[in-house]
Structure formats: structure tokens, C-alpha cells
Design a protein with these regions (language model features):
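Juxtamembrane/transmembrane-helix boundary motifs in multi-pass membrane proteins
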Residues: 18-22, 26, 48, 90, ...
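Alpha-helical membrane-inserting segments
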Residues: 37, 41, 45, 63, ...
Length: 197
């Protein structure tokens, strides 16, 4: 099925289109690659105003769009397990259980929610329409911020949580949403052209 047009229909994911006969090995390789991309995207900082940005949130939601809900969620959970085990996969130097229960805990939960929901929307064809892709990626970013800011509010109060955990990242989020939608449209254009050859 090329497009999912109702909530019960499932469209083929970008990964399934590229590797239609992929099985468990393909899924495992994709999960490992995705968790590596998350780790790299956490470490690379891009100068931006008012604060430098990483591309990690965009990678989370693009994994959802490209992999579909189940594999994207599994990929993000693998990434979090790597961090829980103490591997240096997060933006800072910290890792392990104490780090994951700290101020970033809500955002880490948000990664799982964002990947799962954007993947679910992609399975219904939202990754193929520019407007729907923007909407799906914006929703993915919102799902990332809601638990992140909520947990910061528990730790530091609502006003400080919004001031340090949301407001400085809004401009970068708009940019990453637009860039992510453009990447998905370009990826589908390339895949569609190759399938016609």
C-alpha cells in the first residue's frame, strides 16, 4: 500500500520501501545504525541563537518517520539502554542511571514518545505530504518537550523550566522541523525515482 488514508491503514515505511525483503537482520542493523546516529547527533553542536543546538531531536523524529513506530521506538530504547549502561552516548559527559534520572529524564522519555508517534503518523502516509510531514514533525517535537519541561518543573518550578527548558530552543525547533520535513520529502523523491528505473 503506497499511502495510508485512514487511521486503520498502514503505509509502507521508507525503510521498508528501500529494503522490502529485510527481516530481523535488517531491523537489527537499522536499530544499531539509528542509535549510533543519535549518539553522534547528541555530540555535534551547531552554533545557533540563543543557544547552540544539537540535531538529536530531529534525528529522533526522522527515525520515526523513516522506520515506522515499532522499529523507531526500539531504536530509541536501544540508545537509552546504551546510556543506562554507561556508554557516552548523551550530549554531555554523563551517562548511567543517575544521569538518566536527572534533569534530562523527561526529554529522554520524550524521545520515545516522539519516535513512536511520528512513526505511527508516517505509517499513515504523513511522511509523503510536505504539509503533513511538517505537522507530524512539529507534533513529535512537542511530545519531546512536554515531558521534558514537565520534569524540569517538578525539579525547579514551572517558570524556570519554561525559561531554561523550552524558550531557548523554540527557534531551533522550528528550523529542525522544516529541515526534517524537507529531508523526508527529498528521501521519498529519491526512492520513488529509483523504483521507477
Amino acid at each position: 500500500m503506497a499511502y495510508g488514508t485512514t487511521l486503520s491503514q498502514r503505509a509502507t515505511s521508507l525503510l521498508d520501501t528501500v529494503a522490502p525483503k529485510g527481516g530481523l537482520v535488517t531491523a537489527a542493523a537499522a536499530a544499531v545504525l539509528g542509535s549510533a546516529l543519535l549518539a553522534v547527533s547528541a555530540k555535534v553542536q551547531v552554533p545557533f541563537w540563543p543557544v547552540p543546538m544539537t540535531m538529536q531531536s530531529m534525528v529522533v523524529i526522522l527515525l520515526g518517520m523513516a522506520y515506522g513506530s515499532r522499529l523507531a521506538t526500539a531504536t530509541v530504547l536501544l540508545y537509552l539502554l546504551e546510556g543506562l549502561a554507561g556508554l557516552p552516548v548523551f550530549a554531555g559527559a554523563g551517562a548511567g542511571p543517575a544521569y538518566m534520572a536527572g534533569p534530562t529524564a523527561g526529554y529522554l522519555l520524550g524521545f520515545v514518545l516522539a519516535a513512536g508517534v511520528t512513526g505511527w503518523l508516517a505509517e499513515r502516509g504523513w511522511d509523503r505530504s510536505p504539509a503533513k510531514a511538517v505537522a507530524a514533525l512539529a507534533l513529535g517535537h512537542a511530545l519531546l518537550f512536554v515531558p521534558g519541561v514537565a520534569w524540569l518543573a517538578v525539579l525547579f518550578g514551572a517558570e524556570k523550566a519554561i525559561a531554561v527548558g523550552l524558550t531557548p530552543f523554540l527557534a531551533a525547533t522550528v528550523l529542525k522541523t522544516a529541515l526534517g520535513a524537507a529531508i523526508m520529502q527529498a528521501a521519498w523523491t529519491v526512492v520513488t525515482r529509483r523504483s521507477r528505473v
